[in-house]
Amino acid sequence: MIKQKIINLLQKKINYEKLKIYNESKKHNITHNKNSHFKILIVSNYFINIDIIDRHRKIYSWLSIFFFKYKIKSLSIYAYTTLEWKNKKCKSFFNSPLCKNKPNS
């Protein structure tokens, strides 16, 4: 539900070549909010001539409502231009470890 809302909002704000959103909440020791930790990969030429900090600021500003309304605790952002993504050597960085406080299942 929240994932789709994030997708819908980003579709209105930016033209992108690639968008992936991962819900990483299950990797954390949280029982009351199954939508608390997200990771976003977005590739768009919108980011040309925008430094990494400003890319993140822009995306956070677009998604700020979700932090309060849905109590999102963590958002990791990977924002690239098309050329940066094409030249990226390792694209498997999306394998996040389990949270330190997450008990083994």
Curated annotation (Swiss-Prot):
Gene3D superfamilies noted in UniProt: BolA-like (3.30.300.90)
Source superkingdom: Bacteria
Pfam families: BolA
InterPro entries (alphabetical): BolA, BolA-like_sf, BolA/IbaG_stress_morph_reg
Assigned protein family: Belongs to the BolA/IbaG family.
Protein name: Uncharacterized protein bbp_418
Organism: Buchnera aphidicola subsp. Baizongia pistaciae (strain Bp)
